[in-house]
Design a protein with these regions (language model features):
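Acidic-aromatic/histidine active-site loop/patch
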Residues: 1-4, 224-233, 310-313
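Conserved catalytic-core segment of NTP-binding enzymes
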Residues: 29, 138-275
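Short, glycine-rich, amphipathic interfacial segments at transmembrane boundaries or analogous
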Residues: 30, 277-287
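Residue-level preference for the first positions of well-ordered beta-strands
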Residues: 2-6, 35, 111-113, 155-158
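Walker A/P-loop phosphate-binding motif and the immediately C-terminal alpha-helix
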Residues: 2-42
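Short, amphipathic alpha-helical "lid/cap" segments that border enzyme active or binding sites
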Residues: 21, 299-313
Length: 313
């Protein structure tokens, strides 16, 4: 049975694209057939991870300009032979790259990618569509999922959505079975996550979708630590009651909580379980170029986190 998973966030900068791309690549490496869709049409970035500038995008399919087989690119061989962006002479990197034996032992998976057309014409066509065209595009969203299942026999459909509560991100969520609401442990993310859950996520879960909180870029892993104290980095809440109407967890400042307690409390408050909390790894976060960590550095702790995520799914 195909699983359709959408990575979403209330605001940008949560790392959802990194998580979506690495999850898709890891599943393909494990032998699954994976379709990866860039539906963040306002700020597409798959081209940075996969080093390709698409001519045709998935938004061209939604605009009825091409069929789905023209919008999906078979990227399996390119991923298998992905070259390191870090120079081979850089011996300071602490994690081993893929060995030849590891490459041979992998099962044969498939990875198709639906890039988003970066040209402004494609974005304007979607953004300025009239009501009748938007209804047709909604049908195309559903048709897209059906075609990826029937024609590509996908085991997984991974969607990177636009952040926020835009028309296109909501429709991306509507075709997904599993919704991963990605957030950081800051007041902007938590407040926005509360809005997203109350405004749209409860409607989806009411009709059978499964939603999870996915924490990313959690402080505390990188050494040396920041000048902020532990209590300053971790959100605080009042320990005995649920926040009242109009108040958020981060407005309550009576008792500091560690990450585990905070995650449990927010999940209880929103009625959505947390699936994973991923630390911030500075070597990835501050790299000058994007790359697929799970393929290049299978022993990296971030790769182990993605292993845990796909296993949980």
């Amino acid at each position: 049975m195909t699983r359709c998973i959408a990575f979403h966030s209330y605001k940008g900068g949560t790392g959802k694209t990194t998580l979506a791309c690495n999850s898709a690549a890891l599943l393909a490496r494990k032998g699954y057939k994976v379709c990866l869709l860039d539906l963040d049409i306002y700020a597409p970035s798959f081209q940075s991870y996969f080093e390709r500038e698409p001519i045709v995008g998935i938004n061209d399919f939604l605009n009825s300009n091409v069929e789905v087989d023209k919008a999906m690119i078979d990227y399996t061989s390119a991923v298998e032979n992905q070259k390191d962006n870090i120079r081979a002479t850089d011996s300071s990197y602490p994690y081993p790259t893929r060995s030849e034996n590891e490459k041979k032992l992998r099962k044969k998976g498939k990875l198709w990618i639906g890039f988003s057309n970066m040209q402004k014409k494609g974005v304007f066509e979607l953004e300025n569509a009239d009501s009748a065209t938007k209804r047709d595009i909604i049908r195309r969203f559903i048709y897209l999922r059906e075609r990826l299942i029937s024609d590509f026999h996908a085991d997984y459909i991974i969607i990177d959505t636009s952040p926020g509560m835009r028309f296109w991100s909501i429709n991306s969520l509507a075709i997904a079975d599993i919704l991963l609401l990605t957030l950081k442990m800051g007041s902007l993310d938590v407040d926005g996550t509360r809005i997203a859950v109350n405004e749209i996520y409860k409607s989806f879960t009411k009709f059978g979708s499964k939603a999870y909180l996915l924490y990313n870029l959690i402080a505390g892993y990188c050494v040396p630590a920041t000048v902020a104290s532990r209590n300053e980095m971790v959100p605080t809440v009042e320990s005995t009651s649920v926040p009242q109407e109009g108040m958020t967890l981060l407005n309550k400042l009576e008792q500091p909580l560690n990450e585990v307690d905070f995650v449990e409390r927010l999940s209880s408050d929103l009625g959505i379980p947390a699936i994973l909390s991923i630390p911030c790894y500075c070597d990835i976060q501050f790299s000058r170029r994007e790359f697929l960590t799970v393929l290049r550095y299978p022993e990296h702790p971030f790769t182990k986190q993605i292993e845990g995520l796909v296993t949980a799914l």
